[in-house]
């Protein structure tokens, strides 16, 4: 069974979100997603300053098995990206909920975050 931290929010397309103390939201892919992908070899990230809307294609993850799009879970502005992934994308495999985060965003509406799946709800989607 995949690791599904209870303190995070999720969407059915296997992204996780964490609300930070400063009101930004960190986004990455779940342990289940990285397991399905296999060894990650490349990640294309959004640009800082990008304005994104729900369901926009915002990143691409390439692995030895497949390429997969990552979609915006909520609307907002990208305020930081994980530049470490450019040189070391396999961090996603070893630490998907920690050092393997993709980007941080300032949400347009925090209620959109609150409405996402809980860990239990996400687990039921698997």
From Swiss-Prot:
The keyword Transit peptide does not apply. Residues 24-106 form the Lipoyl-binding domain. Keywords: Lipoyl. One of its GO terms (biological process) is glycine decarboxylation via glycine cleavage system. Gene3D superfamilies: 2.40.50.100. HAMAP family: GcvH (MF_00272). This is Glycine cleavage system H protein. It comes from Psychrobacter arcticus (strain DSM 17307 / VKM B-2377 / 273-4). The lineage of its organism: Bacteria, Pseudomonadati, Pseudomonadota, Gammaproteobacteria, Moraxellales. The gene is gcvH.
């Amino acid at each position: 069974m995949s690791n599904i931290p209870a303190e995070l929010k999720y969407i059915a397309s296997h992204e996780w979100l964490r609300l930070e103390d400063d009101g930004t939201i960190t986004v990455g892919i779940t342990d289940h997603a990285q397991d399905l992908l296999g060894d990650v070899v490349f990640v294309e990230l959004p640009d800082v300053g990008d304005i994104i809307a729900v369901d926009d294609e915002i990143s691409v993850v390439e692995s030895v098995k497949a390429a997969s799009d990552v979609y915006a879970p909520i609307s907002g502005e990208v305020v930081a990206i994980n530049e470490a992934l450019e040189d070391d994308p396999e961090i996603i495999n070893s630490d998907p909920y920690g050092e393997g985060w993709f980007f941080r965003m300032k949400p347009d509406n925090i209620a959109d975050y609150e409405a996402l799946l809980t860990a239990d709800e996400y687990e039921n989607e698997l």
